[in-house]
């Protein structure tokens, strides 16, 4: 009996085991701004304000195009999804065996009753499901260019943290953009970011209040038989 109780306890603990990723922390080195690695100048001209690595043509724009440049991403995400399914099946089966007859064509009786058999079965199934989901994210975040691909596309990455009185709110964004999609104001819409990874969440007591307890997680896990 003790072994059975111990096994049940282990199953409960296994079902309650959390598989969540470690909590997000601020100042993650992976999202730190990238400092461009400019080559050292062989000749240093004292008193000169001109820096060749930062020089722009008279007709060039100021949009991001190099590693370390900053670009503003306008968040405009709005997705809606719905799905429904309805399934219904039915099956009826009937098998009848007429009375068994003898050589003379007369029914064989046992105890005054003829031998005959009848079997019937009926099976019905019906099920329906519906799911609706919508998401909306509006805002802006400034990110930096971390890499320039051979085809001139830009890899961007950045984060924004807002410290509130009951925790922190953060936005993280990574993706690939085309220089042609950047506006003259050095902005781009998030819908034009390829391979975008946009994360908006929070930490602290307010975020923890929305998490399920360990017992609720057990009842929602696959270990719960019902």
From Swiss-Prot:
Molecular function GO labels: cytoskeletal motor activity
Lipid attachment locations (N-palmitoyl cysteine): 16
PROSITE patterns to which the protein is assigned, alphabetical: PROKAR_LIPOPROTEIN (PS51257)
Membrane topology type: Lipid-anchor
An example Gene Ontology CC term for this record: cell outer membrane
Family classification: Belongs to the FlgH family.
Subcellular localization: Cell outer membrane; Bacterial flagellum basal body
S-diacylglycerol cysteine lipid modification positions: 16
Keyword Cytoplasm: no
Domain of life: Bacteria
Alphabetized NCBIfam families for the sequence: PRK00249.1-4, PRK12698.1
Entry keyword annotation includes S-adenosyl-L-methionine: no
Signal peptide feature range: 1-15
Protein name per Swiss-Prot or TrEMBL: Flagellar L-ring protein
